[in-house]
């Protein structure tokens, strides 16, 4: 099993790997909308935070020798489901930019807080 770390994405802030690659599958850890260089949230709006989280995920997938075209399942956590439409727009833009024609399975859930 390959353990994936990349200096271009936000470093893990706890005892976990950015991604692991068992048997050819790349499984990534959750990615917040933080700029990996500044270590801070990119913006207060959820669309830009979603775009940054997906950009971070792209960096980790690339470091694992994978891409967005190989994503089979995504789980998205938001603090308010009223943000659903903004998240969807940013997510759809990401998939289009990555050349993904058939979106992966996905779940979205509201949580009380995010780290």
Regions of interest found by a model, annotated:
Residues 1-73, 78-115:
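N-terminal presequence-like segments and the immediate start of the first folded domain
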């Amino acid at each position: 099993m390959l353990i994936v770390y990349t200096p271009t994405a936000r470093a893990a802030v706890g005892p976990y790997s950015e991604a692991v690659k068992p048997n050819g599958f790349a499984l990534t850890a959750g990615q917040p909308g933080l700029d990996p260089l500044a270590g801070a949230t990119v913006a207060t709006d959820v669309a830009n935070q979603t775009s940054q989280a997906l950009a971070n995920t792209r960096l980790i997938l690339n470091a694992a020798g994978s891409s967005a075209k190989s994503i089979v399942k995504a789980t998205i956590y938001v603090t308010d489901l009223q943000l659903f439409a903004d998240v969807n727009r940013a997510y759809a833009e990401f998939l289009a930019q990555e050349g993904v024609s058939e979106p992966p399975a996905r779940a979205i859930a509201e949580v009380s807080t995010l780290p």
